[in-house]
Amino acid sequence: MIAIIDYGAGNIKSLQFALTKLELDSCLTTDKQTIENATAIILPGVGAFKDAIEALGELDLIRTIQQEASSGKPLLGICLGMQLFYERSYEDGDWQGLGLIQGDVKRIAESVKVPHMGWNTLSHRQKNPLLSNIKENAYVYFVHSYAVSSYQKEDLVSSADYGGMVPAVVQKENIIGMQFHPEKSGEVGLQLLQNFGEMIS
Amino acid sequence: MLAKRIVPCLDVDKGRVVKGRKFQNIQDVDDPVDLAKKYNQAGADELVFYDITASNENRNIFLDVVENVAAEIAIPFSVGGGIRTITDIHQTLRAGADKVSINSAAIKNPQLIKDAALKFGSQCVVLSIDAKAVSENTWQVYINGGRTNTEIDAIGWAIKGEQLGAGEIVINAIDVDGEKNGYNLELTRAIADKVNIPIIASGGAGTKEHFANVLQKGGADAALAASVFHYSEIQIPDLKEYLAASNIIVRREI
C-alpha cells in the first residue's frame, strides 16, 4: 500500500487514478500509523511552500516523514512535494524544508515566462532504473514557478531546460523527486510511476 | 524545449458536449468523457471544459463529469463556467481538475483571483477574458457569455490579472469566435507583449495555418479550438505534423 499524504489543497485524485490504472494500491491519508505501515510514501503538492510545510507541521507529520525516510522506505515527492524534500526554499521568504536532500529552491529566472507551464523534454543525466523505457527528450508536463537551484550533482537523474537547467527527476537513495506531474504526463508519466512502483515491489 | 500546446475545448451543457456560434445556436456534439479520451489518444496537450449552463442544479452533474474525465485521461485539464467562490474552486480541484478558469466572477470580485492564487497556487488559476473590439486596437471585456460590456480595457485587465496572481490567461476573441477565419492575432499579440504568463488564444480557428499564425505571429503559448476538432475538420496528429514542419515545437510522441 502506498500512502499518499493528503495535507490540503490540489488535485490528488488524478494521482490516485493513475496508480489504480497501474494496479498499485494507494490511499489518501494523514494518519501516522497508516504512513508507517505503508510500503512507500508519495508527497504530492501544489500551492505555496510555506503553506505546505505549515500544513505538515500542523498534522505533526514532519518527524514521521523524516523517520520513514531514514528507515529506507521509498518516498516520491511530486512538484512541490519534491521541493519540500530539500533544505530550504526562498519562495516568498526563507523557509526550512524537510532536509532529506541537500540543496535549495529558488524562483525560475525572469528571462522566461513564469510559471513554467506545459510539456517540456527530459535530458537524462545518469543511467537509472527510474528512467527505464523513458526515451531521451520524452515530454512530461510541468507547472511550477520555483525550482531546485542548488543540489548535489550525483542526485540529478534527469533535467529540463527552461531559463536554465531545471532538475526534473532527482534521487538520493530511497528519496525520489519529480518536478513535473507524472500523473498528468500521458503514457510517459504512467511509465515513470510504474518504474517507481517496481522499486517498491 | 517547451512545446506549444494544442487545446481542444469542450462546452458542456447538462452533462453533454455542445457547440454554438458566437455563443448562440447551441448544438449537441458528444459525451464529454468519450470525447476527452479521443482527444487524449490523438495527442491533445490539454483540455478545457466549460460548464455553459452553470446553474446550481446542474453543478453536481458537471462535477461528476470532471471526476469521470480525470479517471480516464492522464493529461491536464482546466474547468470553467460558474466558478464564483473559493469553495467552487476547491470542489472542482478535488473532483480532479488541474486548473480553474475564472471569467465573469473575477470582474465582479478581482480579489477571488488573489485569494485563489494564494490558497491553491497561481498555476491552477486561469483568467479567462472575453474581449470584443470597440475601435481599432482597442478591446473591451464582455461578461455573461458575451452579452454584457463591462467597458474595461482587455489589455489592462490582463495585466491586472497577472498582478493578482493568475498563472495563465485565456483570451477569447468574441468578434471572430465560430467564424473559422483565423484567430485574432492583434489582440493575442497585444496581450502576449504585456504579460509574462502563458497565453492561450481562443476563437476563430478554421485551418492548420490559423494555428501556426497565432502560435508564431500572435505570440500565443497555446491555441484553443472546439468545432474544428469536434467535427473532425482538423485531426490533431495532422495539425502537429504541419506545425512541426512550420518550425513550431510541438509534442508529437504521446
Language-model regions: role of each:
Chain A
Residues 26-37:
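Short acidic low-complexity segments
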Residues 47-117:
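Cysteine-nucleophile active-site neighborhood
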Residues 42-44:
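Structural motif
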Residues 2-24, 180-184:
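N-terminal beta1-alpha1 ligand-phosphate binding loop
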Residues 88-162:
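Pocket-forming structural segment of enzyme catalytic cores
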Residues 164-171:
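Short, surface-exposed beta-strand/loop micro-motifs that present aromatic residues
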Residues 178-201:
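Acyltransferase
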